[in-house]
From Swiss-Prot:
Lipid-carrying residues in chain (S-diacylglycerol cysteine): C22
SUPFAM superfamilies attached to this UniProt entry: Trypsin-like serine proteases
UniProt keyword Cell membrane, yes or no: yes
Family stated for the protein in its record: Belongs to the MG067/MG068/MG395 family.
Keyword Ligase: no
Keywords: Cell membrane, Lipoprotein, Membrane, Palmitate, Signal
Subcellular location field: Cell membrane
PROSITE patterns: PROKAR_LIPOPROTEIN
Protein's name in the database: Uncharacterized lipoprotein MPN_083
Length: 533
């Protein structure tokens, strides 16, 4: 397998940004994947935030994502946005620290109760979710954007969820002579990057493809955007629109030791943090234009960097797969697993790496490691000479070069974005939640601006986010609607996550049904249909 890492977005500038007098539209060309790793040194890394730290609950919510196919390993960051199942179930432990499901023999794990399913929904960027190409995905995501089967080399072979934490795993003998077992034993007592392979491949719950009913044509002289649904087969020079936001569905079979560990040690704390932060009604900000400018911005994610910390991989070995049980009843509507609905992952034996020379995902916060200063603000005219960036908010509808290929089809970015001062997280951090001083998520991080006037493609210290919920106080000068809501929907948004939540009766939908907030409850009485599946 050729290991080419696609680890995030870099947005390249053909002229020096800080001293440019041209417009933002003029010097933003097509975003492209970065294939290097970040070397920034000013951020706090590999430090689990304390319980009273503003970053603490977002640490609980956040994970590193690893998609592997025959061509590449792709890393991104994701965070819990929703779930389905009993988040209060405590998987009991015996004195050896194993979950009850781990201590049963495989022959005992055949009942529907043992095969029950907890489903985590992880938000990330659309360009990160492009790494998921699963033949058993929901339609239309089970084929490429042209309706064709994925080429074999593009198909996702395995998926792992990662976190910087105490590994809490037993020593596994490997085929490596070094590091010695004693060294590994010591490393297992320290905070490390732990990747766990889930028992099955994820699916796509939501992709922000054509969230609004407009198409984009760069050759039109009287306006680039045209009202009406875009058709990939007869679009001519037109292309559809996208926002850099997606949600993947991660099934956890609680009779599988790896899945049980993810649920018990990572997902349950994430659901508790989610509720602490305000649950569905309080977690997702929707503010007016001026409020975004006045906010302070915090970011926690997993950019790929060089560091000396250990990485451990807990794979689906034959022993763990034996703990899975499936129902053959494809009409089964209970919370059990069917063979037809999930793709079992191939075995990946457990292994340990003390140092990976090419870098590994690194827990990083936008906290200055020298001064301790936390967070940042949007870029302003005192820090940059380009007046079109003066308020730190941008309208992607007018930036012709923001084009993304998702599942082999090109789309044009729309919506609004935040430009973060001195928060240039590198590849692998794409998909991180950007949250404000009130601990509300207001946008999702998708890349850093890069200056290509030098041979080194230097990062200029500015990060980019996609705003998830834009109210009517945003006044676009372009044809696309100036309000949208990628999570709960609004009058302009025809494809949004709450449609999936309703169809699958998730935690978010249960809260939407009972809310008195008209904006969050928009879809309760909406006749807007699900656009993608």
């Amino acid at each position: 397998m050729v290991k080419v890492w696609k680890i995030g977005f870099g947005v390249f500038l053909p002229t020096a940004l800080l001293f440019s007098a041209c417009s933002f539209k003029d010097y933003i060309p097509t975003p492209s994947f970065r294939k290097d790793f970040s070397t920034e040194n000013n951020f706090v890394k590999n430090k689990v935030p304390g319980k009273d730290d503003i970053y603490s609950k977002f640490y609980d919510l956040t994970f590193s994502l690893n998609f592997v196919n025959n061509q590449a390993q792709e890393f991104g960051t994701g965070w819990l946005i929703d779930w389905k199942g009993d988040e209060n179930k405590n998987l009991s432990k015996n004195k050896e620290g194993q979950t009850a499901s781990q201590t049963r023999s495989s022959s005992e794990q055949t009942t529907d109760q043992d095969a029950n399913l907890f489903t985590a929904y992880i938000a990330t960027n659309l360009h990160v979710a492009d790494g998921l190409k699963n033949d058993q995905d929901y339609a239309p995501y089970n084929k490429d954007g042209w309706g064709q089967p994925y080429p074999y080399q593009q198909k996702t072979q395995s998926f792992l969820l990662g976190k910087y934490t105490k590994p809490n795993v037993q020593l596994v003998k490997t085929n490596y002579e070094k590091p010695e077992d004693a060294v590994i034993e010591q490393k297992l007592k320290e905070d490390s990057l732990l990747f766990i392979q889930t028992s099955t491949l994820p699916k796509t719950a939501y992709a922000a493809i054509d969230p609004v009913n407009f198409s984009y044509n760069p050759t039109r002289t009287n306006g680039f955007w045209t009202a009406g649904k875009y058709n990939v087969y007869n679009g001519g020079n037109s292309i559809g629109n996208y926002a850099d936001f997606a949600v993947i569905e991660v099934p956890l079979v609680l009779s599988n030791p790896n899945d049980a560990k993810i649920y018990q040690e990572w997902i349950r704390p994430a659901t508790q943090a989610y509720k602490y932060l305000g649950d569905v009604e309080g977690l997702f900000a929707k503010k007016g234009y001026r409020s975004y400018i006045q906010d302070f911005y915090h970011l926690l994610g997993y950019p790929v960097t060089k560091n000396t910390k250990s990485e451990f991989i807990l794979g689906q070995s034959q022993g763990t797969v034996n703990h899975m049980s499936f129902s053959n009843d494809e009409s089964n509507t209970t919370n059990t697993i069917t063979k037809a609905s999930l793709t079992q992952q191939p075995h990946k034996e457990q292994s340990a790496y003390v140092v990976r020379e090419s870098g590994l995902p690194t827990l990083t916060m936008n906290v200055d490691k020298y001064t301790g200063a936390k967070g940042t603000h949007l870029v302003n005219v005192d820090q940059i000479t380009d007046l079109s960036l003066g308020d730190g908010l941008i309208d992607f509808g007018g930036l012709s070069r923001f084009i993304l290929q998702y599942h082999n089809v090109n789309y044009k970015q729309f919506g609004y974005g935040t430009i973060l001062w001195d928060t240039n997280f590198g590849g692998g951090s794409s998909g991180s939640a950007i949250f404000n001083q009130n601990k509300q998520i207001n946008s999702i991080y998708f890349g850093a601006l890069v200056n290509v006037t030098t041979d080194r493609n230097e990062n200029v210290g500015l990060g980019l986010g996609q705003i998830l919920r834009a109210p009517n106080t945003f006044n676009s000068s372009h044809e696309v609607p100036y309000s949208y809501d990628l999570i709960f929907g609004d009058v302009n948004t025809t494809n949004f996550y709450a449609q999936f939540a309703k169809k699958h009766n998730t935690h978010m939908w249960s809260k939407i049904q009972s809310t008195q907030n008209g904006e969050i409850g928009f879809h309760k009485n909406s006749k807007t249909g699900q656009q993608r599946h």
